[in-house]
UniProtKB/Swiss-Prot annotation:
Pfam families: PALP. Homodimer. Pyridoxal 5'-phosphate binds at N75, G179, T180, G181, G182, T183, S267. GO terms for molecular function: cysteine synthase activity. The keyword Transferase applies. One of its GO terms (biological process) is cysteine biosynthetic process from serine. Belongs to the cysteine synthase/cystathionine beta-synthase family. Its cofactor is pyridoxal 5'-phosphate. This is Cysteine synthase. The keyword Transferase applies. It comes from Streptococcus pyogenes serotype M6 (strain ATCC BAA-946 / MGAS10394). It comes from the Bacteria. The modification N6-(pyridoxal phosphate)lysine is found at K45. It catalyses: O-acetyl-L-serine + hydrogen sulfide = L-cysteine + acetate.
Length: 313
């Protein structure tokens, strides 16, 4: 039955989970993906954008007309931009200049202002610039890398949706990329209590494997591996770490569109590559779930879709 909603913010969450059919080897475990692109702003970050703003409103920190400023690699900025537009805030987004053109355009299309920082400085540079501007403008910073409303919303929504979907199916592994760590931490906190047999895998870029104790470095997987360990990441929430090379993330993302029929972003390619590796290890009869954070349309100008897709036989 079709329902009439009072505001677009009511559409956040309850994203679908589907089983992959053509990318997975015959003898591997079944792989399921949660498509966060079905959120209004087309990414998982819509959840935390709404959660952080509403938590701040409840605490009396902000009200419509105020300025919100945030450093972000893109998707959180998009989420804050559209939620801010719907609620009546002035939104300023600060991001490294290396982020995709589409992300910049979408943020500005929602009426937000955009400030770019040198790509070589990574997220640290964007954070430093944001802190300076916040003081100058008297703006409120959600601080997604520190805000407890980030992992909390995944405990309250994402994890509950997963439990509901898998109440008749054993979930043997949960795989998640780590940007702020909010998704992985929030979901893991719930799964470890409700489904302790589920193994939790954290995914990071091979070239910037900070979780594995390596030095940060440049990589191409936009949205994960920020180069430091965020406060919103519970490092006890995962059981194992999988490091994914940028080239493998790119290739897997391309194949997902060509083989499964939906376009995904680079971090989705990384998560899916890792999930398939886990599925191969577990074997037939097991079940693996991963989160696909966004869609591929905001990466059409990047090298992700700048090469012909080669279909595997």
């Amino acid at each position: 039955m079709t329902k009439i909603y009072k505001t677009i913010t009511e559409l956040v969450g309850q994203t679908p989970i589907i089983k992959l059919n053509r990318l997975i080897p015959n003898e591997a475990a079944d792989v399921y993906v949660k498509l966060e692109a079905f959120n209004p702003g087309s990414s998982v970050k819509d959840r935390i954008a709404l959660s952080m703003i509403e938590a701040a409103e409840a605490e009396g920190l902000i009200s419509p007309g105020d300025v919100i400023i945030e450093p972000t690699s893109g998707n959180t900025g998009i989420g804050l931009a559209w939620v801010g537009a719907a609620k009546g805030y002035r939104v300023i987004i600060v991001m490294p200049e290396t982020m995709s053109l589409e992300r910049r355009q979408i943020i500005q299309a929602y009426g937000a202002e955009l400030v770019l920082t040198p790509g070589a400085e990574g997220m640290k540079g964007a954070i430093a610039k944001t802190e300076t501007l916040a003081i100058e403008l008297g703006a409120w910073m959600p601080m997604q890398f520190n805000n407890p409303a980030n992992p909390s919303i995944h405990e309250k929504t994402t994890a509950q949706e997963i439990l509901e979907a898998f109440k008749e199916i054993s979930l043997d592994a949960f795989v998640s990329g780590v940007g702020t760590g909010g998704t992985l931490s929030g979901v893991s906190h719930v799964l470890k209590k409700a489904s302790p047999e589920t193994v939790i895998y954290a995914v990071e870029a091979e070239e910037s494997a900070v979780l594995s104790g390596q030095e940060p470095g440049p990589h191409k997987i936009q949205g994960i591996s920020a180069g430091f360990i965020p406060n919103t990441l519970d490092t006890k929430a995962y059981d194992q770490i999988i490091r994914v090379k940028s080239k493998d993330a790119l290739e897997t993302a391309r194949l997902t569109g060509a083989k499964e029929g939906f376009l995904v972003g680079i971090s989705s390619g990384a998560a899916l590559y890792a999930a398939i590796e886990v599925a191969k290890q577990l074997g037939k009869g097991k079940h693996v779930l991963t989160i696909l954070p966004d869609n591929g349309e905001r990466y059409l100008s990047t090298e992700l879709y700048d090469v012909p897709v080669i279909k595997t036989k």
